[in-house]
Amino acid sequence: MSTLARARFLLPLVLLLSACSEAPKTVEKTKAPEKPPEPLTGRQAFQMMYPQARGWAPDAQPVEMRSINLSQVKGEKGKAGAWGAIFVSPALGKSRTYTYSAVEAEGNLHQGVFAGIAEDYAVGRGPSPFLPAALKIDTDQAYDTAAEKSQDYIKKNPDKVISYLLELNKRFPDPTWRVIWGESVSASDYSVFIDATTGMLLEKMH
């Protein structure tokens, strides 16, 4: 076989071998940017914590729930980065605090739902429990109602942090959302009570 004929014979074989030996090209996938942690409304957080409380005690009832503002989570109207709730079990004679947080944070806040240690509880002492079915109004709705009747205060205090407190106040028949301009009741000079069942504005506190 001539040199030219041999080259013509070997060329396809060389090309085939080189094609087989090439490493497959990997397609680089661009990673989608991580979503920032999102705040929740009061009812959303309650619905995360209540099943956990029922798992601890089937007769668990809420006594109080409050918002917890976090620097890591951008707040929105009627929403907070973390929430804390106290549930009681008359059958066990115990109370237990649960928290929901969008992120790991100071103050023993863990991402998701976290249960605290059960403590002694005596029926008739302290705040009264209420039925979960009474919680029909969410915090974003409570905020809208409170803000509508608080425009003068908001104009003078546009950057105030807003907090939320849910409890059964002895002055009102239904549980109430207290919309608080400030980090807490004690640190606030203005708050509004909203009926958590009907959504009605009940009282302004100065």
Labelled PLM ranges:
Residues M1-S18:
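Sec-dependent bacterial lipoprotein signal peptides
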Residues C20-H206:
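Long, terminal "pre-/pro-" and other extracytoplasmic accessory regions
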